[in-house]
Design a protein with these regions (language model features):
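ATP/nucleoside-binding phosphotransfer catalytic cores, i.e., glycine-rich phosphate-binding loops
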Residues: 203-210, 229-320
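Glycine-rich phosphate/pyrophosphate-binding beta-alpha loops
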Residues: 156, 160, 217-231, 298
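Catalytic core of DAGKc-family lipid kinases
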Residues: 47, 83-214
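Short amphipathic alpha-helical segments
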Residues: 23-25, 79-82, 106-108, 229-230
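ATP/NTP phosphate-donor binding region
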Residues: 1-69, 76, 116
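Short glycine-rich anion-binding loops that position phosphate/pyrophosphate groups of nucleotides
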Residues: 16-17, 71-74, 98-101, 157, ...
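Short glycine/serine/threonine-rich phosphate/pyrophosphate-binding segments
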Residues: 53, 73-78, 103-104, 129
């Protein structure tokens, strides 16, 4: 196996990730690349605000590789920036997870990064990774035009989205991270805000169906919430979206054990749960302000259309 050559590389690091530890990790990464010559030339830029990583990735012309150093949020921004570039010149993506979720990194096989050992970068290979495209409409914007956003791992609507979005404030209060944080947020959301979400759904152009969903997850990778295996068989390189949704009305007493069983992917055979695969999905929401998340970031919409862009992004993946 040949040693990895990232070529000219841009490192985009969120210095606030992992309670500020990511800044030190970025400096160690610089020294590692310098000593091992894994990149012919590299530049390090620290993000300064929300959306900055997207801007930097969009402007990363002339680079072969962009390394996203941070959690799922900074990776999501970097992916959205890279997807604005023409495919012929679009840099490849590498990730070093320094966050609280890290589902995308786990899908790539990077699940034990400590911030000190960069061994995952020593022997990597390029693979073509699917990307999800979201077209969303928000009447409050007044434009009537769709907003386009991309995601690399997870899109969901309903109680699971509320759980994911609720982890931000809960992390500040508790200091928890990863699956324990997501589980605690789940117990909180089920206790305070549990409900069914009426919506109309259509997959691959089939006739629309009205459902009362408690969750609607449209996945590229198998997990969300730091390891919850919501779509256990999802493959981010197969050109297909994997969908898990639970239709109600589902009583809270049934839904909570179902949520907990999803940690190990044991929910898929339960009666309220439906599993399917598609390339295109359309969701129209009957009420405003449904919780919607893409890679843990909020989406505001009354209607969304989702497509899979097969093999749209080259991604460096550690070889086993």
């Amino acid at each position: 196996m040949h040693a990895t050559d990232f070529g000219r590389t841009l490192i985009i690091a969120n210095p606030a990730a992992q309670s500020g530890a990511a800044h030190e990790v970025a400096e160690r990464l610089q020294r590692f690349l310098d000593m091992t010559a894994r990149a012919s030339q590299f530049d390090l830029v620290l993000t300064e605000r929300m959306g900055h990583a997207k801007e930097l990735a969009a402007q990363a012309t002339g680079y072969r590789t962009v390394i996203a150093l941070g959690g799922d949020g900074v990776i999501h921004e970097v992916v959205n920036g890279l997807m604005t570039q023409d495919e012929a010149v679009r840099p490849a993506l590498a990730v070093l997870p320094v966050g609280s979720g890290n589902d995308f990194a786990q899908t790539l096989g990077i699940d034990d990064f400590s911030g000190k050992d960069f061994g995952a970068l020593l022997t990597c290979e390029l693979q073509r990774q699917d990307i999800g495209r979201i077209r969303s409409w928000n009447p409050a914007s007044g434009s009537g035009e769709a907003t386009v956003e991309y995601y690399d791992q997870t899109l969901s609507v309903g109680i699971d989205a509320a759980i994911g979005l609720g982890t931000t404030e809960l992390r500040k209060k508790t200091g928890l991270a990863g699956a324990p944080l997501y589980t605690l947020s789940g117990l909180e959301q089920f206790g305070l805000r549990y409900r069914n979400y009426p919506m109309t759904v259509s997959f691959d152009g089939a006739p629309a169906e009205r459902v009362r969903a408690i969750i609607m997850a449209i996945q590229l990778g198998p997990t969300y919430g730091s390891g919850y295996r919501i779509c256990p068989d999802a493959d981010p390189c197969d050109g297909i979206l994997d969908v898990c949704y639970a239709c109600g009305p589902v009583p809270r007493a049934v839904a909570l054990p179902m949520f907990l069983s999803a940690k190990d992917g044991h929910h898929t055979k339960l009666p309220p749960v439906r599993m399917r695969r598609c390339r295109h999905a359309e969701l129209t929401f009957e009420e405003p302000d449904y919780p919607i998340q893409a890679d843990g970031e909020p989406v505001v919409a009354s209607r969304i259309e989702v497509d899979v862009l097969g093999g749209a992004l080259h991604v460096w993946r550690p070889t086993r």
